[in-house]
Every structure is written in C-alpha cells, then in structure tokens.
C-alpha cells in the first residue's frame, strides 16, 4: 500500500497551477449578458439530482454563442470533404 503522505506531493494535482476563477463581469463586457449558462456546475450535485451535465444544454435549442469553441469542436480533426470526382475514383 502506498504511503499517503509521500504520494500526496508527487501528485500532478498538487503541483499544478490552480485554474483561475471566471470573472463574470468580463463575460458581460463581451456581450454575453446571460451568464447563467456559464456558471460552474458541481458534478456531485448533478449526480444527486439525477440530471446529466448536458441536460441543461438540451433545454436551450437556440444554440450557444460559444458552441463552436467547445473543446470537442476545437480539438477534433476536421471532417474530410470528398468531391464527386474523388468519389468516382473509388
């Protein structure tokens, strides 16, 4: 069994820089006045209520102004475009 005292300081979570708090006034300055969408949700509270983290997003069908900058869309490989003449070669 590992010694909890020595493993505490070798942890990545102990030595990394803390994530800064989000200043909601900066979002309002960018024109995103509806800051209720961007509030931090506690995952344990979501587990207790039985709601999935994405359930609130499904309630908002008009879309999100920052949706194109989500981590999934930003870091995924672009979809390859296949033209009709390339398809004929297959």
UniProtKB/Swiss-Prot annotation:
Residues forming the motif Nuclear export signal are 24-32
Q: How is it modified after translation?
A: Ubiquitinated, leading to degradation.
Residues bearing PTM Phosphoserine = 84
Q: Which InterPro entries match?
A: MLLT11_fam (IPR026778), WRNPLPNID (IPR033461)
One Gene Ontology cellular component annotation held by this UniProt entry? centrosome
Q: How does it assemble?
A: Interacts with HSPA8 and LAMP2 isoform A; the interaction may target MLLT11 for degradation via chaperone-mediated autophagy. Interacts with TCF7.
Assigned protein family:
Belongs to the MLLT11 family.
Name this polypeptide is given: Protein AF1q
Q: What is the lineage of its organism?
A: Eukaryota, Metazoa, Chordata, Craniata, Vertebrata
Q: What is the gene called? A: MLLT11
């Amino acid at each position: 069994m590992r010694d909890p005292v020595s493993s505490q300081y070798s942890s990545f979570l102990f030595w990394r820089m803390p994530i800064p708090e989000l200043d909601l006034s900066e979002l309002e300055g960018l024109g995103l006045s509806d800051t209720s969408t961007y509030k931090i949700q506690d995952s344990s509270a979501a587990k207790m209520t039985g709601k999935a983290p994405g359930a609130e997003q499904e309630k908002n069908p008009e879309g999100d102004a920052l949706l194109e900058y989500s981590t999934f869309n930003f870091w995924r490989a672009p979809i390859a475009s296949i033209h009709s003449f390339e398809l004929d070669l297959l």
